[in-house]
Design a protein with these regions (language model features):
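Sec-dependent bacterial lipoprotein signal peptides
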Residues: 1-21
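Bacterial Sec-dependent N-terminal signal peptides
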Residues: 16-45, 121-124, 128-152, 294, ...
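Conserved structural position at the C-terminal beta-strand
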Residues: 117-119
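Coil residues (strongly favoring Ser/Thr
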Residues: 24, 41, 65-66, 85-86, ...
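Surface-exposed, flexible coil segments in extracellular/virion-facing regions
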Residues: 74-102
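Solvent-exposed loop segments of extracellular immunoglobulin-like
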Residues: 60-74
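Exposed beta-strand face motif in extracellular beta-rich ectodomains
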Residues: 107-113
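Conserved positions within compact, well-structured domain cores
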Residues: 137-346
């Protein structure tokens, strides 16, 4: 009898749990979906002090929704903010802005900005974008590992007052960093904060006239002389690959403490020349003038002054896994590369 009672109690409990579980499923609320996502635009790299007014794409209720309420929006920026910032509620008039003003703080980190559109009875619609905060200038700048052999060797570009250190190699003065003149070209990933870190990316037509007065693009002959000075060779063929010793021109640089050149045992990065080549990569330009960027952390590229026919020009590049300087050619209008400027040594 006792066993029967125990069995009955267990069975009764199981039935109750099953009934409760079914009821929970029956009570589960299903929401509808809003139309669209609140997408917005912010550069992939930003710098302290910049102010961005972020404008989300409009989100709407389904066409069969007869409610007179609107759509609410809230924002958050991790790890900067810990609370959601509601800029518009459902009851607000449509004229109330859903925009969000973001001021970039003075710190080095990756921030994730999130915008959510919400309405009662609907799942929230969310969009997010990540940005890396970098510091282009100062002792705590993001780009580390660039050395200036002689700090007295510096020029000021009269067009924008930017300063460039230079070093002397093979009878020429060479910029130690990529040209950052913003009167032409595009910054890396279309992020103005990167102009003074990776330099600007120029088409050859832009690069041909981008250097400051008294400076010019290096020729293949200039790169040949540079390589001969490194190897002691007496090569005379300028339009070819130069083998070996390019680690003498590469800088073991870091961006926000992230190593730029990937390590390869066959490449001895030591920057003996002070040229401080870094792997900023290259870009292609489509017919609408928009750029796509490739090869950062893998390629150093630099335009030469030499044309390769009516619509192409030569550029030099160094790949992470080889101590060589290779030769390529690209469209004068659709291929974009950083630039180093040279002049005859004074």
């Amino acid at each position: 009898m006792t066993h029967n009672r125990l069995f009955s109690a267990i069975a009764f409990t199981f039935i109750l749990l099953l009934a409760f579980s079914c009821k929970k499923k029956e009570d589960k609320v299903e929401y509808n979906y809003l139309n669209g996502t609140p997408k917005f635009s912010i550069p992939a790299y930003v710098q302290p002090g910049e102010v961005y007014v972020l404008h989300p794409r409009e989100v709407t209720r389904p066409s069969d929704d007869t409610s007179t309420d609107g759509i609410g929006y809230y924002w958050s920026v991790s790890p900067i903010t810990t609370k959601k910032d509601t800029v518009r509620t459902e009851k607000d008039a449509a004229s109330v802005s859903a925009d969000y003003t973001l001021t970039i703080p003075d710190t080095l980190c990756t921030i994730t900005t999130t915008c959510s559109a919400f309405a009662e009875g609907y799942y929230s619609s969310t969009s997010e974008a990540s940005s890396i905060i970098v510091k282009p200038y100062g002792e705590d700048r993001s780009l580390k590992g660039i050395t200036y052999p002689d700090k007295s060797k510096v020029i000021t570009d009269s067009r924008d007052s930017k300063k460039y250190y230079y070093t002397t190699a093979a009878g020429l003065d060479w910029f130690v960093e990529n040209l950052a003149f913003e009167g032409a070209g595009k910054p890396f990933l279309d992020s103005p904060a990167m102009a003074d870190i990776f330099g600007m990316f120029y088409t050859w037509n832009e690069a041909a006239k981008a250097c400051p007065a008294g400076w010019r693009l290096p020729s293949n002959e200039d790169f040949l002389a540079l390589h001969n000075s490194l190897t002691g060779a007496k090569n005379t063929a300028a339009k070819t690959t130069f083998y070996g010793n390019m680690g003498d021109c590469m800088a073991d640089a870091y961006l926000n403490d992230i190593k730029l050149w990937e390590f390869w045992p066959g490449v001895n990065i030591n920057n003996k020349t002070g040229l401080a080549m870094i792997p900023a990569g290259y870009a292609t330009i489509n017919e609408d003038g928009n750029a796509r960027y490739y090869g950062s952390t893998y390629y150093y590229t630099c335009w030469t002054s030499d044309e390769a026919g009516s619509d192409k020009a030569y550029y030099r590049y160094v790949y992470a896994d080889k101590p060589d300087m290779l030769l390529g050619s690209g469209s004068k209008t659709d291929f974009a590369s950083p630039v180093r400027c040279v002049r005859t040594s004074e």
